């Protein structure tokens, strides 16, 4: 009889083991729905900036109210958590926001200011931002001054990309952003990243130094390049509260001039002081003896070539900047950690593999409006945690407000 009981127990154990299956691969942890028109593969490295959404707007209508949104950069600290700043301000569409940073733990955090200050990342991957918000400046075509003192601008009105501050990452993977937000084309301060991956940003906004040439003219570039963000050990992303503006230069006669964006056609000046721009963005205009500036007749196809790029903001990249890549719907940071929505609905970077109990680790995309999305959702929530906001994909409490995570290209400055 005892022998029969042993056989039965063995049979039951075998059946139980046969029914057990290991957890599914993390790359399959993806939402069932996808964002219409979303890009799941992006060719270049990019960062993110936190753009608050009006609390009276629904998630479905949020994309149509971009012009009334205040933008702040998110930061990431080392543990991979993503956090945002605590104050918001209305800015124009595509206004420049501070880039977010990441610390070591991968957490993403944003500061309480919505200035365009760059964000940093600490070791845990958390992303954090500063607490202040400021209005951003819109970037217009650079103007030049001729010998008679007249100030003229080019004839082409190209739509340059707005410059946002780069974000940084700390060791834990948390992402944090600065507390101030700038309008389009404003330059944000660079952010750093610590070991845990958290990203955090500073709280002040500062303009880049200007230069002066012999005649006293002051010149500045037309692109407001934002400082890149840094990352600390835990992966958290944090951003500084300062925003750095593009430096301007001054020439000998005291006139102040700004450089043109690389996407805009170069303009030339002729003897009579008139300034003319070429119709082809890749061709420079010529100058004749009477001072008139003339442009080439070829039409530019550059706008059409870049029209499919959903990202229209740029930021300077520095050491520790929160650098993200999107391939096949999988989001990774500069340390190769996986961007995921963890069990408490927080957005952070971990692994690989992602944190145990992660809900989503794939299914990321960039929407046609240039916002980061998970599945068919591009609305995230910044929830106050001390002096920073953590970022979540769902509303989890009264201290949470909806935001968009705007993608920003990172460039070497």
UniProtKB/Swiss-Prot annotation:
Domain of life: Eukaryota
A Pfam family reported for this protein in Swiss-Prot or TrEMBL: PIR1-like_C
Site-annotated residues for Covalent attachment to cell wall glycan: 81, 107, 126, 150, 174, 198, 217, 236, 255, 274, 292
GO molecular function (one): structural constituent of cell wall
One GO CC annotation: fungal-type cell wall
Keywords per UniProt: Cell wall, Cell wall biogenesis/degradation, Cleavage on pair of basic residues, Glycoprotein, Repeat, Secreted, Signal, Stress response
Chief localization: secreted
PIR1/2/3 repeat extents: 73-89, 97-115, 116-134, 140-158, 164-182, 188-206, 207-225, 226-244, 245-263, 264-282, 283-300
The record's account of how the chain is modified after translation: Covalently linked to beta-1,3-glucan of the inner cell wall layer via an alkali-sensitive ester linkage between the gamma-carboxyl group of glutamic acids, arising from specific glutamines within the PIR1/2/3 repeats, and hydroxyl groups of glucoses of beta-1,3-glucan chains.
Gene Ontology BP terms: fungal-type cell wall organization
InterPro entries in alphabetical order: PIR1-like_C (IPR054508), Yeast_CWMannoprotein_PIR (IPR051153), Yeast_PIR_rpt (IPR000420)
Entry remark concerning the domains of this protein: The PIR1/2/3 repeats are required for the covalent linkage to the cell wall. Their number varies among different strains of S.cerevisiae.
Protein name (record): Cell wall mannoprotein HSP150
Native source species: Saccharomyces cerevisiae (strain ATCC 204508 / S288c)
Gene from which the chain derives: HSP150
